[in-house]
Curated annotation (Swiss-Prot):
Family statement drawn from the similarity comment of this UniProt entry: Belongs to the 'GDSL' lipolytic enzyme family.
Signal peptide, first to last residue: 1-24
GO MF annotation terms: lipase activity
Keywords in alphabetical order: Glycoprotein, Hydrolase, Lipid degradation, Lipid metabolism, Secreted, Signal
Record flagged with keyword Secreted: yes
Residues annotated as glycosylated: 100, 255-256, 260, 320
Record EC number: 3.1.1.-
Protein name: GDSL esterase/lipase At5g03810
Organism, as annotated: Arabidopsis thaliana
InterPro entries for the chain: GDSL, GDSL_lipolytic_enzyme, Lipase_GDSL_AS, SGNH_hydro_sf, SGNH_plant_lipase-like
GO annotation (BP), single: lipid catabolic process
């Protein structure tokens, strides 16, 4: 009975939210995005780095079929989230030429492909560290304050949803391939190391006036096509369980750390968004979600290609990415991002209620 009441309340709240969106009003004043390639909207485009996506076939199903720097064939989960919140445009990449006075008032995207909780991960790939993303956010706050005044600006910052999605690069592009880190840390110890950075980040963001913060869990790392290729052994197309176990362990600690932060920071709404289970369910039961393929990605051979390896000359790229859970070796397709975003909507009710 309790479960029924809770579900009914959730459905009622969602219905009210959609009614509000129907009037043309947004549910929050702004949407702020930080993190890695899963949510990068083009901040790496003009950096000297191999981690870019501003060329075909990336973006082939996006608005105007343009490669904006998003690591997908189309929309990111955060793009769908912006739509669900009532925004008519997506948070603009802060370092892009499109970032101007008008669209900055409804938020911005500071994410950078190959960034992580650990700044060392981003530095290795010449990506934008999480520390620098926070500095860019402070600069953004000054710009908004100059436009609308301090009082209105503070209302925007405190009412905005700040979404952080990172951590996969720390494991897949750093820890698992770096023998030095392997000697220094066990996977469990490395998680603790990352979560100390996460805790500091949230406290700093809170100090800048943020009161609504969402953070995504790690995905099932061992089910990403590139991870299966790199760590699964020859001829294996099954998820790598030890990597998934590391992700589950990290996610448990992420939840506990977030609870402690909420208890110690008055007025903070902090939600941990579970993307592990929604993505795992799509991998295990693709047909239930309308997918045909969940082990290989759409781009190229589907086993490894990402960033510059996923290009217009990649042989074997699929013609219809909606059949695939993954677009490239590391990133979900637009269709999978839509499923993830719908899950975020339900989980995120505490941030907008």
């Amino acid at each position: 009975m309790k479960m029924f009441i809770t579900m009914s309340m959730c459905l009622s709240v969602i219905a009210c939210f959609y009614a509000g969106v129907g009037t043309g009003e947004t549910l929050v004043p702004a949407l702020i995005i930080m993190g890695d390639s899963v949510v990068d909207a083009g901040n790496n485009n003009h950096r000297i780095t191999l981690v870019k996506a501003n060329f075909p076939p990336y973006g082939r199903d996006f608005v105007a079929h343009s490669a904006t720097g998003r690591f997908s064939n189309g929309k990111l989960a955060t793009d769908f989230t912006a739509e669900n919140l009532g925004f008519t445009s997506y948070p603009v990449a802060y370092l892009s030429q499109e970032a101007n006075e008008t669209n900055l008032l409804t938020g911005a995207n500071f994410a950078s492909g190959a960034s992580g909780f650990d700044d060392a991960t981003a530095i290795f790939y010449n990506a934008i560290t999480l520390s620098q993303q926070l500095k860019n956010y402070k600069e953004y706050q000054n710009k908004v304050t100059n436009i609308v005044g301090k009082e209105r600006a503070n209302e925007i910052f405190s009412g905005a949803i700040h979404l952080l999605s990172t951590g996969s690069s720390d494991f897949l592009q750093s820890y698992y391939i770096n023998p030095i880190l392997n000697r220094i840390f066990t996977p469990d110890q490395y998680s603790d190391h990352l979560l100390r950075s996460y805790s500091t980040f949230v406290q700093n963001l809170y100090g800048l006036g943020a009161r609504r913060i969402g953070v995504t869990t790690l995905p099932p790392l061992g089910c990403l096509p590139a991870a299966i290729t790199l760590f699964g052994g020859v001829g294996n197309n099954m998820c790598v369980e030890r990597l998934n176990q590391d992700a589950v362990s990290f996610n448990t600690k992420l939840n506990n750390t977030s609870i402690n932060l909420t208890n110690n920071l008055p007025g903070l709404k902090l939600v941990v968004f579970d993307i592990y289970n929604p993505l795992l369910n799509m991998v295990i039961n693709p047909v239930e979600y309308g997918f045909f393929e969940s082990r290989r990605a759409c781009c190229g051979t589907g086993t490894m290609e990402t960033s510059f390896l996923c290009n217009a000359l990649s042989v074997g790229t699929c013609s219809n990415a909606t059949n695939y859970v993954f677009w490239d070796g590391f990133h979900p397709s637009e269709a999978a991002n839509r499923v993830i975003a719908n899950n975020l909507l339900v989980q995120g009710i505490p941030l907008i209620s």
